[in-house]
Design a protein with these regions (language model features):
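Helix-to-loop junction immediately C-terminal to a conserved catalytic motif
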Residues: 30
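Conserved ABC transporter NBD signature motif
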Residues: 38-48
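ABC ATPase NBD coupling module
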Residues: 47-64
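Conserved ABC ATPase "signature" region
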Residues: 94-109
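Conserved ABC ATPase signature
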Residues: 113-123
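Hydrophobic anchor residue at the start of the ABC signature
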Residues: 127
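Catalytic Walker B motif of ABC-type/P-loop ATPase nucleotide-binding domains
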Residues: 138-141
């Protein structure tokens, strides 16, 4: 796979049945796993050879990832979960973040502990967290699996608006229910 900081194809959908490797694929792209044959290239650099510090830099400024399992901290609030990422990058203002909470219908959950929120609400918080950093690509691993159609549309609009602002590519994985976007390439595993 070849990724670039100036993507010519900017919107991918990776579709497959459950258990067929979508999350594994994402783990390869973001450098969490290296047990693969072939190459993952970013701007012609083979990421298989990256050091830990190179991966940290890559994840901080080039690749954002919305995990299927979300990886939020249940004992802290929604805003605190988002701010952990935002403090690393200093990329978004609190006003922008609060606007996203409002647009996604969870403005009343800003100070709620994640562990007391529904999975769909947590999914929206995780998307906000994924957007508070600079990126050349964002990987959204089954991002709307627990959302109604309206919230899925809003989340897709927010993600695409931010990706366009940053001139970034988007890779969405799905088992069937996916954001209704104008995908430029669909890959079926």
């Amino acid at each position: 796979m070849f990724l670039t900081s100036s993507p010519s194809i900017s919107l991918y959908l990776v579709e497959a049945d459950s258990g067929k490797g979508k999350s594994t694929f994402c783990s390869y792209v973001v450098g969490y796993r290296h047990d693969y044959d072939g190459n993952v290239l970013f701007d012609a650099d083979n990421t298989h050879n990256y050091t830990v510090s190179q991966w940290v830099s890559m994840r901080r400024t080039h690749i954002s990832h919305l995990f299927q399992e979300l990886r939020l901290f249940p004992e802290i609030t929604a805003m605190e979960n988002v701010q952990i990422q935002n403090k690393l990058t200093g990329f978004k203002s609190e006003e922008e973040i609060l606007q996203w909470f409002d647009m996604l219908g969870i403005a009343d959950k800003v100070n709620a502990k994640i562990g007391r929120m529904s999975f769909g609400q947590q999914q929206r918080v995780a998307m906000i967290r994924a957007l508070v950093q600079p990126f050349d690509f964002i990987l959204a691993d089954e991002p709307i699996s627990h959302l109604d159609d309206n919230n899925a549309r809003i989340m897709g609009d927010i993600m695409m608006t931010e990706a366009k602002k940053q001139g970034a590519g988007v890779i969405v994985t799905s088992i069937g229910k996916h954001m209704d976007l104008n995908y430029e390439r669909v890959v079926r595993l």
